Amino acid sequence: MDKPRILSGVQPTGNLHLGNYLGAIRSWVEQQQHYDNFFCVVDLHAITVPHNPQTLAQDTLTIAALYLACGIDLQYSTIFVQSHVAAHSELAWLLNCVTPLNWLERMIQFKEKAVKQGENVSVGLLDYPVLMAADILLYDADKVPVGEDQKQHLELTRDIVIRINDKFGREDAPVLKLPEPLIRKEGARVMSLADGTKKMSKSDESELSRINLLDPPEMIKKKVKKCKTDPQRGLWFDDPERPECHNLLTLYTLLSNQTKEAVAQECAEMGWGQFKPLLTETAIAALEPIQAKYAEILADRGELDRIIQAGNAKASQTAQQTLARVRDALGFLAPPY
């Protein structure tokens, strides 16, 4: 029996941080043997907002190398670059032509980012969810790992599938597969070190708001030392008046691979002066093997290029099958080759 297929990806917009790792990538690694996995570096998504063309290519390689360093296993998973598979752009256009504009205008993430960009907001940012839908649908994904902030985009993908299948498919022969969300509640939202009510993000202007996977020990120590806390003694979870306390305890729980109950007992009587060195030591120990593996991978650039090339080829072969099916359903003349 074929394994269910998963599709997910990360933008190459700077270093990955603990939010990316604990909220997504680590769960991919833990579950990968149960699925047929396609993990993408979504560089086309990265240019929907202002980006640095001088660093995009290197950032793309960094994300691919970090996938491997974090434990993505090529026995179970395919790693590829989104822009290297032309079918993503073509399917996105075909989906655009059947997706109502008002579906996109109600997307919460677009509204939030459009406010920041003002008149300079791009059509690409508005259309981001349709490209995401193309990413998912090209690979007939059964499951899509999503955080709470991406659930609306996956719901849009499902709406697009239903619309296309109703218009162009048959009940016994749908054009596109309807994907299901794969939501991991524990650690799904790792919050900022500077504000426990905001998600840890690469787009935050302050480097002190996040711990990057490639941060050296001294930088981790500095960031934990400066992270926002409160004056209370004793540490506990789930207090809405202490969001930073809950966030830092959650980080320690995930990085130390302990249960919430064990951490609650261990830290109940601690002050921040005792807890912060403990969190620092735990974060450094958790990231050391990832950083060592990353350095090993980058030391053999040729092998990394071969991995990406092989992944691109496999992804393209799979994607072309779906694209041909959609083109046929929409009535296009098949190319004579």
From Swiss-Prot:
Record's keyword terms, sorted: Aminoacyl-tRNA synthetase, ATP-binding, Cytoplasm, Ligase, Nucleotide-binding, Protein biosynthesis
Example GO molecular function: ATP binding
Binding site for ATP: 11-13, 19-20, 147-149, 190, 199-203
One Pfam family cited in the UniProt record for this chain: tRNA-synt_1b
Assigned protein family: Belongs to the class-I aminoacyl-tRNA synthetase family.
Annotated function: Catalyzes the attachment of tryptophan to tRNA(Trp).
Protein name: Tryptophan--tRNA ligase
Organism of this sequence: Synechocystis sp. (strain ATCC 27184 / PCC 6803 / Kazusa)
Lineage summary: Bacteria, Bacillati, Cyanobacteriota, Cyanophyceae, Synechococcales
